[in-house]
Design a protein with these regions (language model features):
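Active-site acidic catalytic loop and adjacent metal/ATP-binding pocket
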Residues: 33-44, 48-49, 81, 168-218
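Short hydrophobic/aromatic patches at helix-to-coil boundaries
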Residues: 259-262
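ATP-binding pocket architecture of kinase catalytic cores
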Residues: 28-135, 146, 180
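Active-site Asp-x-Gly
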Residues: 58, 180-185, 198-253
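A cross-family signal for key residues in well-ordered alpha-helices
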Residues: 69-72, 224, 256
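Conserved N-terminal boundary motif of the eukaryotic protein kinase catalytic domain
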Residues: 19-28
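An alpha-helical support segment within catalytic cores of ATP-dependent transferases
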Residues: 8-18, 121-188, 247-250
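Phosphate/pyrophosphate-binding loops and the adjoining catalytic core of nucleotide-dependent enzymes
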Residues: 2-3, 68
Length: 262
């Protein structure tokens, strides 16, 4: 549920006051990250978004800012960073809105084709040109840090893992780690709400803070999981067929397990 629209909150960066005068702020709630998101609207002016997060060792917003800038420069549709600053002990990001809406209005066949095509285009980028390393060596170290810091929400585990501890699942991650990685530029959190469409056309990726060089199964696992939950297993399989290539079922399961820690 979204909050009621308000004027610019007093804790927002004062340097934005003139530029954002007249905008109404509407809270979008919080997703899986600790960031808070507001949608900004004003008559005859472009819709904007503000994202903010408490500054900490585990904050993800600085990483998202860097990745949005790189991704926009690589020609992939995503929010454009308009300004970023630190104020009131928080990191603040002002960005453009990606046109369109979530994929929920699309017919199943169109949805799976759109998601497959969008991910193929992203994965076709040259990973050697991407400065963000999300290979398993680094990701597993991040998982270890999150487990040790008590940041993993065990109550939010999927049904397959409910009742197990984060430490237990971390050991399982280490035991089942794939021997090789099929590296691409991956979104890192390719669940359906993070892909938008305008009409029948893909319009952009959002929530790009985990983008980086990683195994393509990272994205395929989360997209297929969401498609199965929304449309059924047959459509998840159709998505993987539409994406093409040699898909490894064990690696899909592995990256779904990895996602439990974020």
């Amino acid at each position: 549920m979204h909050d009621a629209a308000t004027s610019m909150p007093p804790q927002a960066p004062s340097t934005w006051a003139d530029y954002l005068a007249g905008y109404r702020w509407r809270g979008q709630g919080e997703g899986c990250s600790a960031a808070t998101v507001h949608r900004l609207e004003a008559a005859r002016r472009p819709t904007l978004f503000v994202k903010q997060e408490v500054l900490s060792a585990h904050a993800e917003l600085p990483a998202e800012i860097a990745r949005l800038r790189w991704l926009h420069g690589a020609g992939i549709d995503c929010p454009q960073v308009l300004n970023e600053t630190q104020s009131d002990g928080r990191q603040w990001l002002l960005m453009s809105a990606v046109p369109g809406d979530t994929l929920s209005a699309l017919a199943p066949e169109r949805l799976v084709r759109l998601v497959a095509a969008a991910l193929r285009r992203l994965h076709d980028l040259d990973p050697a040109a991407c400065p963000f390393d999300h290979r398993l060596e680094r990701r597993l170290d991040t998982v270890r840090q999150r487990v040790e810091a008590g940041l993993v929400d065990e109550a939010d585990f999927d049904d397959d893992h409910r009742g197990r501890s984060a430490t237990e699942l971390y050991r399982l991650l280490l035991d089942r780690r794939p021997a090789v990685e099929d590296l691409v530029v991956a979104h890192g959190d390719a669940c359906l709400p993070n892909l938008l469409a305008e009409g029948r056309r893909f319009s952009g990726f959002i929530d790009c803070g985990r983008l980086g060089v990683a195994d393509r199964h990272q994205d395929l696992a989360l997209a297929a999981r969401d498609i199965e939950a929304e449309l059924g297993a047959a459509w998840a399989e159709a998505f993987l067929v539409e994406y093409g290539g040699d898909i490894d079922g064990e690696r899909l399961a592995y990256f779904r397990l990895l996602d439990e820690f974020f």
